Amino acid sequence: MCLSNVYLDEKKQDKLVIEEASQVIVDDANVHVQTIFGESKNLEGYYVSEVNLMENYVILRKK
């Protein structure tokens, strides 16, 4: 199973939004992130800047 950590702006521990995200949904103005354990966060005004599937992380940035 490939789960990814989600960060704001850069891959640093203090920028970590959610660990082991199983789903990232993007709509016009929001990014919704959810784990397999049901934890979720909705980030308004962000976009997906980078997805690294080899290192299992996602970077979000403010629009």
Feature-to-residue mapping (PLM):
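Compact, glycine-rich, soluble single-domain proteins
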Residues: 2-63
